[in-house]
Design a protein with these regions (language model features):
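Glycine-rich phosphate/diphosphate-binding loop of Rossmann-like nucleotide-binding domains
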Residues: 1-66
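Adenosine-phosphate binding glycine-rich loop
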Residues: 89-184
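Rossmann-like adenosine-cofactor binding region
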Residues: 40-108, 115-116
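Hydrophobic alpha-helical scaffolding
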Residues: 1, 10, 44-54, 63, ...
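Short glycine/serine/threonine-rich phosphate/pyrophosphate-binding segments
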Residues: 1-9, 29-30, 71-76, 95-97, ...
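Alpha-helical scaffold segments in soluble metabolic enzymes
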Residues: 6-10, 56, 60-63, 76, ...
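A sequence-level detector of short, solvent-exposed, charge-rich linear segments
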Residues: 22, 38, 76-77, 83, ...
Length: 184
């Protein structure tokens, strides 16, 4: 979907070295003849052409970022990942795996889209500041560089990251100003 595509594009632009995208039929790559135009666009951002299922692609993976459906990621799959994996289970209202289950399976950092768990990843972290910055600085088009700068500004608000605080809360009073400042 649109969220997954945007995440992949920005991770690639930021320099992520090994991105694998997976849909209901498995890893997306040039080996697939069933890709629609939206999925074909992803090929330019993927650093690999790994084939296989979600299960195959998770073996020894460091990070899982999901924007799909509740329950997709099981504790057993987390246990096949690298030691201390990072899990961003962003499906709403129910994430791909619940934080307690991910942690029990060995995840070091867990983020969801929900405000009732630590590390809420939500567009409310970025949009108010992006719009404030665009208005204040007369920016007519939000670019990928603006999005990366906003992500960096958010990250800098957490001076001493912990497993339960890798990103500020959307309710942190500094968020809007920090993001707005970098939209120029």
């Amino acid at each position: 979907g649109a969220a997954g595509t945007a995440i992949i594009k920005l991770l690639n632009l930021y320099g992520a070295a090994h991105i694998i995208a997976v849909d209901s039929r498995g890893a997306i790559g040039t080996h697939r003849s069933d890709l629609n135009s939206e999925k074909t666009v992803l090929l330019q951002y993927l650093n690999t052409d790994q084939a296989g299922s979600l299960e195959d692609t998770l073996v020894d993976a460091d990070i899982f970022i999901g924007v799909s459906r509740a329950g997709l990621l099981t504790p057993e799959l987390v246990q096949t990942m690298a030691t201390n994996p990072i899990i961003f289970a962003l499906a709403n209202p129910v994430p791909e795996i619940m934080p307690a289950a991910a942690k029990q399976a060995g995840a070091a950092v867990i983020a969801t889209g929900r405000s009732d768990f630590p590390n809420q990843v939500n567009n409310s972290l970025a949009f108010p500041g992006i719009f404030r910055g665009a208005l204040d600085h007369h920016v007519q088009k939000i670019t990928d560089q603006h999005k990366l700068a906003a992500a960096e500004a958010l990250a800098q608000l957490v001076a001493h990251p912990t497993a339960d605080m890798v990103i500020p809360s959307p309710f942190d009073s500094r968020v809007v100003a920090a993001v707005a400042q970098v939209i120029r």
